[in-house]
């Protein structure tokens, strides 16, 4: 798949001096290695200083510890490789069913769809490998489901909920960064409902994620892997990182700077169930287009400015007009257009939401809107 494209980071409140923020999906290229510390031609030699000659016994895991979480989750996280001739890419995935259904990011496997015609190989924690095929994709949400061939004894991951997460909550990330399968990192939830705009690795189609932000180390290859709570329950799908841009022309991706983003599992699980049952997913729509804020510009007002309203759509039926400014969705403050897109996409078609709207006269009122749904078109 090659290095994924960098995309625009969410607007920040202050300029960065001497360093640009870049946001990238975190699938990795095959064959790049970890860097000069690893030599693929010869094994690394590690010299132990003062080590005892007897083999130490594993330390028993403390209940609720990262060690216990890792032991529970690792068998349910896989490494995914997509090969297209001499090119390839890699990422991670989580096990949904004993017979081989796996959840991952669309950008991990999209190059194996349609004319891409790449071959997908999945490797389990025990080293077992098998081919896989795409069940369905939703590029707009960066979600895909694939199925590993000839499986019946996989260990599905425990599904949690992203509805009651809290900033500061401890979390664990599991995946295959830089091809290092079964890597476990830990951190906290740094923020919730973070609008994150990313570009697809192959198609270039953008996704706006309503993301969980974490400082757990996430690197290229972690895409599609698990973000879990301290009960070992899946709460998010790791998808993107922010990194400091450099002047390098090599195309290499930067690593973690403590700004990782995951798709909340409640949204991902709704979509994966639609993909499994019908092969396509639906997306909630408000029926508006939004005035974009130029990249790098600071907003002069708070809210998402409505540029146009689709006749007969949900916003039109609620009396929202072009030029209006949406400042809240339910109790959530909407500072800009990406925030409105992320908030709407976090809902399911048919959900009724409350919008706080400022009209052209400066007056503010609240309207109830029932979201419509559209089918996301994406080939297998």
In which residue ranges do the predicted regions lie?
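C-terminal recognition in membrane/secretory proteostasis and scaffolding
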Residues: 1-44, 133, 270-380
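A conserved glycine-rich beta-strand in the N-terminal activation segment of trypsin-fold
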Residues: 12-20, 60-66, 81-99, 129-133, ...
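Terminal peptide-recognition signature
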Residues: 30, 34, 75-80, 93, ...
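N-terminal activation segment of mature serine protease catalytic domains
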Residues: 30-92, 273-277, 377
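Interdomain regulatory linker/hinge segments that flank or connect interaction modules
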Residues: 38-42, 51-57, 239-291, 374
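Conserved active-site neighborhood of the chymotrypsin/trypsin-like protease fold
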Residues: 82-89, 97-182, 338, 343, ...
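Active-site loop architecture of trypsin-fold serine endopeptidases
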Residues: 84-89, 108-118, 154, 174-186, ...
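Short, conserved beta-turn/loop elements at beta-strand boundaries and strand-helix junctions
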Residues: 98, 137-141, 192-198, 239, ...
